[in-house]
């Protein structure tokens, strides 16, 4: 087995947008001329695999934490929810300020589209709270 040149724990990744005023939101990996960069998710079904720990200016090095089911993370919530609620990316397409936040599937209306499932809430939460989340991955269509 060859597992050289791998990394564990927090990573320093180049930003593809100004993330200097953000933390505790999800960011997704993208290709920029052959370079891995992270930005807040551009679509509701993007693969937002990292929690932003410390943001940075465009082209700077942001500290991100890869999500793993082995470790809970805290992510900024959009709206309220309950323990056990499935969490998906908030609708950052309609409201840019919500990019990278999570919301409960229970709050989605029928026919609203496909969303990236990112975790399960492990506590009661309200809008703007850093909700304790157990990461999981998938898609939810409503």
What are these regions (language model features)?
Residues 1-142:
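Glycine-anchored, exposed beta-strand/edge motif detector
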């Amino acid at each position: 087995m060859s597992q050289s040149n791998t990394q564990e724990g927090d990573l320093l990744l180049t930003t593809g947008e100004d993330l200097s005023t953000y933390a505790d939101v999800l960011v997704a990996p993208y290709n920029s001329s052959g370079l891995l960069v992270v930005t807040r998710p551009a679509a509701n079904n993007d693969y937002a695999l990292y929690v932003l720990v410390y943001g940075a200016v465009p082209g700077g090095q942001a500290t991100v934490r890869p999500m793993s089911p082995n470790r809970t993370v805290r992510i900024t919530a959009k709206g309220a929810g309950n323990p056990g609620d499935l969490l998906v990316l908030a609708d950052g397409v309609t409201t840019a300020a919500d990019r990278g936040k999570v919301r409960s599937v229970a709050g989605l209306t029928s026919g609203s589209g496909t969303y990236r499932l990112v975790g399960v809430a492990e506590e009661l939460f309200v809008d703007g709270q850093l909700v304790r989340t157990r990461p999981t991955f998938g898609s939810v269509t409503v």
